Every structure is written in structure tokens, then in C-alpha cells.
């Protein structure tokens, strides 16, 4: 579930779950069956083990600190895998930290890109499930667990590090999802500022105006790094410069969590 959206996102109405209409919709039985088959057929490396943490959902940091986290989803979809290197280049050029949530099957197809992302200390990598399903619609808890565990294994095999942060696809979750993530050692991370970059009307100018007008202390912004047609990369330099001009410090989600809960172990990635 998501907190109801209180505003019109760009020019597109939000659903009650807080997601844009263009980003929602349940998969057909055929698509769901294909996702099940993909997950079952994947040759999984050994799954890493993290100590369990208390079930926790984070959607923003402290409101009394002008810190903001830029996050990017690399979604696993039915379409061929994509990677927008311009997003990475914009972040590196601005020396901007970011948290990037990797889909497991996306990571399996984009091996070189995942390794490159992991090579930059300013980037924090998280888990975005293996096949990008609607998790609350999954009746079998073992399938929810498999989506997370399989991605943990994939990222660990490629980077040598195990994510401690988890973002459910489509911003959809229920108490089972948060609990299972905690049992696997991950904090569930949502957001309070959807950029709207998947929307067809989301031009560079609209993305910049929207993010800068809605940014608040502690905000977690969500964008995407897996689609070449989005205007995310074009907007990023102005978004980053605008946030800094307004006095914001860019941080990772892990740093936001540390400020909320000093000493938290559920931050960043584990060896």
C-alpha cells in the first residue's frame, strides 16, 4: 500500500496507491506465469545471508535536515533490458550520490553496467526484486521471498556486496512484504517524491520544475535508469544544481536512515 497522493503529478492523475496510472496495472495470467517460470529457471548463485532486522518501512528522512536522496530504479521488465548511461554520467559529473535499486534479471543482463555502478563509492545499490511483480498480489509468501533472495544472490555474485535496502516494484507493498524483507535483513524503502519520469508528458522542463517545487527536507526522490526514452538524464543536471542552490545536501538512502536511526546496521551494502 502507499500513502494516498495529495497532488496532481505533472498533468497525470495519481491512483489511490500513489502511483501514476501509466505505472500500474496487474499482469495477465500469461505474464505472471512467465515471471514464475523465469524465476524458477534462473540458475541462482548461493544466496547471501544477512542477520534479520526489525520490519521497517522508510519513505523519507528527517524533516529537520536539508538532506535529500536521489534514487533510481533499474526495473526488470518483459522488454529487452536497457541501461541509460547518461544518468550515470550526469551523477558522476555532478559528484552526486545516489541509491540505485537493481532488478535481478536486469542485473543478469547488464553485467558490465552493474559492475561499473558498484565501482563508484558514491552509488549505493539496493534490491528491486527479480522479475518486477506486483508483490501484494502474490498469495504464496515463498514467491515473495524468492524474488528478493534471487536478486540478493545476483547482486552479490556480480559486485561482491549484498544489498541491505529493498524497494518493492510499483511502490506496492503489504505487511507481509515488509516482514519478509526484514527477515532477510533488508529495510523496505519507498519514497515521498515520485519524479514522474515514466509519464509521456514528462519533458525535461516539467521534471525539473516538479522535483524542485516538491522537494522537502528528507525527501526520497524516485527516478529510473533503465529506459532510454525517459528525459531523466536531460533533467538531472538542472535538478541537482537546483537542489543544491536551495541548500539541500544530496545523500544516499543509507545516510538518511543513519540520521533517522544512528547505528542502524541496515544501511548500504554488506560484504
Where are the regions a protein language model picked out?
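C-terminal domain-boundary segment and adjacent tail
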Residues: 50, 57-63, 230-271
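Solvent-exposed loop/turn segments at secondary-structure junctions
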Residues: 74-78, 104-108, 130-135, 170-175, ...
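His/Asp/Glu-enriched short active-site or ligand-binding loop at hydrolase and phosphoryl-transfer sites
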Residues: 172, 178-214, 247-259
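Post-signal peptide N-terminal segment of mature Sec-exported envelope proteins
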Residues: 22-50
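Bacterial signal peptide processing site
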Residues: 15-18
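CE4/NodB-like, metal-dependent polysaccharide N-deacetylase domain
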Residues: 89-102, 124, 141-174, 179, ...
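Active-site beta->alpha N-cap acidic-glycine motif
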Residues: 42-127, 131-139, 147-154
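C-terminal motif of bacterial Sec signal peptides marking the signal peptidase cleavage site
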Residues: 11-13
Amino acid at each position: 500500500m502507499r500513502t494516498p497522493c495529495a497532488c496532481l503529478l505533472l498533468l497525470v492523475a495519481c491512483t489511490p496507491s500513489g502511483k501514476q496510472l501509466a505505472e500500474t496495472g496487474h499482469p495477465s495470467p500469461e505474464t505472471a506465469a512467465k515471471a514464475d517460470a523465469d524465476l524458477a529457471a534462473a540458475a541462482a548463485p548461493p544466496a547471501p545471508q544477512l542477520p534479520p532486522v526489525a520490519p521497517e518501512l522508510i519513505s523519507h528522512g528527517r524533516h529537520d535536515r536539508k538532506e535529500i536522496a536521489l534514487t533510481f530504479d533499474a526495473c526488470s521488465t518483459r522488454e529487452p533490458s536497457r541501461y541509460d548511461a547518461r544518468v550515470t554520467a550526469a551523477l558522476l559529473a555532478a559528484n552526486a550520490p545516489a541509491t540505485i535499486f537493481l532488478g535481478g534479471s536486469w542485473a543478469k543482463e547488464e553485467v558490465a553496467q552493474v559492475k561499473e555502478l558498484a565501482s563508484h563509492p558514491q552509488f549505493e545499490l539496493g534490491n528491486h526484486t527479480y522479475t518486477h511483480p506486483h508483490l501484494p498480489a502474490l498469495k504464496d509468501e515463498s514467491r515473495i521471498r524468492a524474488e528478493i533472495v534471487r536478486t540478493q544472490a545476483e547482486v552479490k555474485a556480480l559486485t561482491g556486496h549484498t544489498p541491505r535496502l529493498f524497494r518493492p516494484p510499483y511502490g506496492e507493498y503489504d505487511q507481509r512484504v515488509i516482514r519478509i524483507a526484514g527477515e532477510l535483513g533488508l529495510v523496505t524503502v519507498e519514497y515521498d517524491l515520485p519524479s514522474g519520469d515514466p509519464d509521456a508528458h514528462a519533458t525535461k522542463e516539467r521534471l525539473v520544475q516538479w522535483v524542485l517545487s516538491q522537494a522537502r527536507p528528507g525527501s526520497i526522490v524516485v527516478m529510473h535508469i533503465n529506459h532510454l526514452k525517459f528525459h531523466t538524464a536531460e533533467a538531472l543536471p538542472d535538478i541537482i544544481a537546483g537542489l543544491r542552490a536551495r541548500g539541500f545536501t544530496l545523500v544516499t538512502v543509507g545516510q538518511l536512515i543513519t540520521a533517522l536511526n544512528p547505528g542502524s546496521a541496515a544501511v548500504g551494502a554488506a560484504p
